[in-house]
Swiss-Prot record:
Coiled coil: none annotated. The gene is kdsA. Keywords: Cytoplasm, Lipopolysaccharide biosynthesis, Transferase. The keyword Ubl conjugation does not apply. It catalyses: D-arabinose 5-phosphate + phosphoenolpyruvate + H2O = 3-deoxy-alpha-D-manno-2-octulosonate-8-phosphate + phosphate. Belongs to the KdsA family. HAMAP family: KDO8P_synth. One of its GO terms (cellular component) is cytoplasm. This is 2-dehydro-3-deoxyphosphooctonate aldolase. It holds the Pfam family DAHP_synth_1. InterPro entries: Aldolase_TIM, DAHP1/KDSA, KDO8P_synthase. It comes from Thioalkalivibrio sulfidiphilus (strain HL-EbGR7). Pathway: Carbohydrate biosynthesis; 3-deoxy-D-manno-octulosonate biosynthesis; 3-deoxy-D-manno-octulosonate from D-ribulose 5-phosphate: step 2/3; Bacterial outer membrane biogenesis; lipopolysaccharide biosynthesis.
Length: 280
């Protein structure tokens, strides 16, 4: 699949979607995007900058949600123009989709909304590539129905994203079999390595996380075979205004990415023997 300025799929090198969970300031966005662009160029990984103008699903009303639509889009446009990278942001049911699609290169739908038919189809109709996050409550094979909804809206630039499955209270687990199953949709599969270590609502009024396991799950996903990785990052995650506990530290991003790129090259050069049994 053609995605921004590169090809995405198991026949192509892994790509990275990364940035702070939420837009905190213009300067942080520019600094983070610039550093990510440079390190991705050194490693040889295509890059899409990600950050949100509004986090509508925070645990508490006391949690920081973002800078809002107008200021958020202005900053994303500035990142595009000054840093020269494609940008992605998530949208919600009350988002003016046409306004957002006029600025960003990729639209993302939140996991909680993956079953909302009208929403998925309205996003797909904007003519942008869409990254559909699989709900924490959804089986991987059920993503076929979600993808069908998007395609029926006339969009064939669809990605599906795994971000963990609910396992008891305040805990997520990642079933790597689901990555292979979701390939049967015919869409590039993305693994969200940072939200997969989140502990939803684990701190009462905010979510906890175990960022020390981000490399473990990222390596496992790349070894299983994915088109791309989604990893939120921050220069100082402990001071991040949203999802800091599961964000990967920006100073450690290049070191991790080198390992993942090396592993991706080896795995994709060998092919995927399980495809003989799966409809991929």
């Amino acid at each position: 699949m053609k995605l921004c300025h590169f090809e995405a799929g198991l026949e192509h090198p892994i790509f990275l979607i990364s940035g702070p969970c939420v837009i905190e300031s213009e300067q942080l966005a520019l600094d983070t995007a610039g550093q990510l662009k440079e390190l991705c160029e050194r490693v040889g990984v295509p890059f899409i900058y990600k950050s949100s103008f509004d986090k509508a699903n925070r645990s508490s009303t006391r949690s920081f949600r973002g800078l809002g639509l107008e200021e958020g889009l202005r900053i994303l446009e500035t990142v595009k123009q000054q840093i020269g990278v494609p940008v992605l942001t998530d949208v919600h049911e009350d988002t003016p989709l046409e306004e957002v699609a006029a600025v960003v290169d990729v639209l993302q739908t939140p996991a909680f909304l993956c079953r909302q038919t009208n929403f998925i189809q309205n996003v797909a109709r904007q003519g942008r590539p869409v990254n559909i996050k699989k709900g924490q409550f959804l089986a991987p094979w059920d993503m076929g129905n979600v993808v069908d909804k998007a395609r029926e809206a006339g969009n064939d630039q669809i990605m599906v994203c795994e971000r963990g499955v609910s396992f008891g209270y305040n805990t997520l687990v990642s079933d790597m079999r689901g990555l292979a199953v979701m390939r049967e949709t015919g869409c590039p599969v993305v693994f969200d390595a940072t939200h997969s270590v989140q502990q939803p609502g684990g701190k009462g009024t905010s979510s906890g996380g175990q960022r020390e396991f981000v490399p473990v799950l990222a390596r496992a996903a790349v070894a299983s075979g994915v088109a791309g990785l989604f990893m939120e990052t921050h220069p100082d995650p402990d001071k991040a205004l949203s999802d800091g506990p599961n964000a990967w530290p920006l100073p450690l991003m290049e070191e991790l990415l080198v390992t993942l790129k090396t592993l991706d090259d080896v795995v994709k050069a060998q092919g995927f023997i399980e495809s003989r049994f799966l409809n991929t």
